Amino acid sequence: MIRGNDPILLTPGPLTTSLATKQAMLRDWGSWDAAFNAITGSLCEDLVRIVHGEGTHVCVPMQGSGTFSVEAAIANVVPRDGKVLVPQNGAYCQRILKICKVLGRAHVELPIPEDRPATAAAIEAALKKDPSITHVAQVHCETGAGVLNPLPEIAAVCARLGKGLIVDAMSSFGAIEIDARTMPFDALVAATGKCIEGVPGMGFVLVKKTVLEGSQGNSHSLALDLYDQYTYMQKTTQWRFTPPTHVVAAFRTALDQFLEEGGQPVRGERYRRNYETLVQGMAVLGFRPFLSPDVQAPIIVTFHAPADARYDFRTFYEKVRSRGYILYPGKLTQVETFRVGCIGAIDDNEMRNVVSAIGETLREMGISMQPEGRVRAA
């Protein structure tokens, strides 16, 4: 799917983008220009449609990385006297805990092993144990290891117990089904440089209208105030502060390609084929995935590092990179791993090519793989 000599990014974002998406950034836009503001408006409408949130939810775009929008969502949706339950099974859950701490929001951590998903039963028990909890902040796809947390069941528990739900869908939005009609949430956060296959620089929050209307004054920040951002956009069609114009234009092109491809079902199926091709090919080389297939999201796969003493991730990374592929280091605490992403403007043929590149690298490093061998400790 990719032409030219650019490296293929096998990461959970930034990721490899199409030529058309890159070309969309060749034009300059005025941030107050009506044509540019129409692009922003059309993006927001389409993003709400992807989760079937028409009439109940609105889209608030926000400058910056996805984490900016996660912080904005927590700061606006959770009142200053609120309390957040954070099911924690990875690095991005830990980031939410840090955000809550910095914001001064009371919070409770629900520890979960990094190779297991959160469960609705555990969340329900935690909510019943502490009735003062007002919200749950749930990472949908925890890309620290690649775990897919069961959002439909968690959303049902929150709705039944009257708790607000904030979803970090950074690495799942556009690839895994999310339906606001059957998975109620107060806010859902994603970003341009993930499964819609745009470039980094803008996040967005899909927030329930009634929740946003009641959030005035909650935010600790001027720049991250979703209520102010939305009301200003409604009045003027403009962003409050300078938007990432090239990022927005590229995202419009990426979203057009997403819709032309067939939307979430087809995009998700392509990523699943990428995942299956990768795992099957790596198994032939002797690599074992860290996660069980029943909890693995088809977004990024964590593999155990070779047990061979000659293995060094930096050397391995550079040699694979010299063959045109950029991998991701592991983010786990107990075992040494590395990660390979399955998302971006790539297909299963590209996954076969990366498996070949990894196999060549192993031979060059003199590494012998034993599929059932030891796992090298971190």
Swiss-Prot record:
Molecular functions (GO terms): 2-aminoethylphosphonate-pyruvate transaminase activity
EC number: 2.6.1.37
Entry superkingdom: Bacteria
Keyword Transferase found: yes
Gene Ontology biological process terms from the UniProt entry: organic phosphonate catabolic process
Keyword rRNA-binding part of the UniProt annotation: no
PTM-bearing positions, type N6-(pyridoxal phosphate)lysine: 194
Enzyme class: transferase
Keywords: Aminotransferase, Pyridoxal phosphate, Pyruvate, Transferase
Catalytic activity from the UniProt record: (2-aminoethyl)phosphonate + pyruvate = phosphonoacetaldehyde + L-alanine
Coiled coil: none
Cofactor(s) needed by this chain: pyridoxal 5'-phosphate
SUPFAM superfamilies the UniProt entry points to: PLP-dependent transferases (SSF53383)
Subunit structure: Homodimer.
Function summary: Involved in phosphonate degradation.
Family: Belongs to the class-V pyridoxal-phosphate-dependent aminotransferase family. PhnW subfamily.
Protein name: 2-aminoethylphosphonate--pyruvate transaminase 1
Naturally occurring in which organism (per UniProt): Cupriavidus pinatubonensis (strain JMP 134 / LMG 1197)
Lineage, broadest ranks: Bacteria, Pseudomonadati, Pseudomonadota, Betaproteobacteria, Burkholderiales
